[in-house]
Amino acid sequence: MPDYDLIAILGPTASGKTPFAAALAAELNTEIISADSRQIYRGMDLGTGKDLEDYTINGRQIPYHLIDIADPGYKYNVFEYQRDFLTAYETIKQKGCLPVLCGGTGLYLESVLKGYRLIPVPENQELRVRLAEKSLEELTAILSSYKTLHNSTDVDTVKRAIRAIEIEEYYAKTPIEEREFPQLNSLIIGVDIDRELRREKITRRLKQRLDDGMVEEVRRLLAEGIQPDDLIYYGLEYKYLTLYAIGKMTYDEMFTGLETAIHQFAKRQMTWFRGMERRGFTIHWVDASLPMEEKINFVKQKLKEF
């Protein structure tokens, strides 16, 4: 095995990156580290698209890390992700394996691939008051003016956007010291799915997850005492399904709004990954529609080329 420290599999939602990563991990006899900002929560399964059955290949369970590690309602952040990633990474490396990082949360991916440690950012009440009356569109415009690392792909609520700006303001005014974080030599593989196929898969998967009980999952979380605002904070499925569950939306409004939001989210993910390329990352793109064996051979060939 060449001197790569990590293989990263990234792609938009519904691109098939998880089955690909699991099949690759089975082939290389290794383990997966998730890079998904919502799959870290226990009990939030259908709404985050965990699809844990994808980690079973030919009857063999592929070990995965950083899924189901926090309770719903908790505000897990990128600083904790870096810490937990390193723990998982070192655990896998100690077994003599090449870890596979897989996910679609741009901030989490880039925070470990870029190789510098982020530091916790305190709340700025004065800034929060100043931004409180602004719309999500206005806040997104402010956020896009910053050049540093914040993941606008996951900013789909006012609360998240304000927190994102708070982080950017803090970094803009705080000298960035050299921070200890391993410089990982990573082979980055992007799963490129045709736009129309992606849209079709998103809609089909949304209908399937609703049939499987996604509304009931949200109602259960609410019944367990998770506050509606906390679920709405997680965005996408949890935002729309919570608004439906508490009577603020009809079923049709929920479905149409959520379907549109997921399509927009996937588009923003691709914009983020293209931005990574502009920021100096080399992403080797593989066609999502290729047979699994061909995709795995593509990665193995890239490993040999190193």
From Swiss-Prot:
Catalysed reaction(s) here are: adenosine(37) in tRNA + dimethylallyl diphosphate = N(6)-dimethylallyladenosine(37) in tRNA + diphosphate
Spell out the Pfam families in the cross-references: IPPT (PF01715)
* Coiled coil segments of this chain: none
Interaction with substrate tRNA, as annotated region: 36-39
Print the keywords alphabetically: ATP-binding, Magnesium, Nucleotide-binding, Transferase, tRNA processing
- Per the UniProt record, the site (Interaction with substrate tRNA) maps to 105
Q: Which InterPro entries match?
A: Dimethylallyltransferase, IPT, P-loop_NTPase
- Enzyme nomenclature, EC number: 2.5.1.75
Q: Which Gene3D superfamilies match?
A: P-loop containing nucleotide triphosphate hydrolases (3.40.50.300)
The Gene Ontology terms for molecular function here are: ATP binding; tRNA dimethylallyltransferase activity
Q: Where on this chain does ATP bind?
A: 11-18
Q: How does it assemble?
A: Monomer.
Q: What is this protein called?
A: tRNA dimethylallyltransferase 2
Q: Which organism is it from?
A: Bacteroides fragilis (strain ATCC 25285 / DSM 2151 / CCUG 4856 / JCM 11019 / LMG 10263 / NCTC 9343 / Onslow / VPI 2553 / EN-2)
Q: Which gene encodes it?
A: miaA2
